[in-house]
Amino acid sequence: VAAAGLSLAKIGACVGAGLAAIAAGIGIGKIGSSAMDAIARQPEETNNIRTNMIVIAALIEGVALFAIIVCLLALFV
C-alpha cells in the first residue's frame, strides 16, 4: 500500500507540474495576442501596452513557478 501511494504521489506531482506549465503557456499566449490587438488599435500606446504585457506575463510565470515548486515539494517531501 505504501509503494502504491508513493507512485500515485509521483504521478500527481508530474501531472500538476505539467498542468501548471500548460496553463502558464496558454495564459501568456492570450496576453501576447491581446497585446498585439491593442497595439494594432492604438499604436501610440505601444510602450504602455508592452510594459503592462511584460508585467502580467511575469506574474503568470511566478504563479506557474510556485505551482511547480509545490508539486516538487509534494513529490520529495
Explain the meaning of each model-derived region:
Residues 1-77:
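Hydrophobic, small-residue-rich transmembrane alpha-helices and their short perimembrane loops
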